[in-house]
Amino acid sequence: MEHRRRPRPANLSRKLRQIRQVLGLSQSELVRRLDPSETMHYSRISEFELGRREPSLLTLLAYARVAGIHLEDLVDDNVELPSQLPGKVVYTPRRR
């Protein structure tokens, strides 16, 4: 059985940077919101935003929670983030 890596979303790093900027957070502030246990170093945010490192699924879920958006909005290159974000937990099941 051959395993293929899934393609990285082309707009992911831009969207991650956009979330931080729209919410008006520094990298350190964002780390505290993403990882309250403080195991993540703030330099990791820069690596995500520059596309040098791909965030884990748990980190992407935390970004979505902090921004108040659905995970699909982050990883779907056909979806643009709104210019204003709720910045709180939003959960409404999506119909497919």
Predicted regions, residues:
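Short, charged recognition helix plus adjacent turn
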Residues: M1-R6, R65, V75-R96
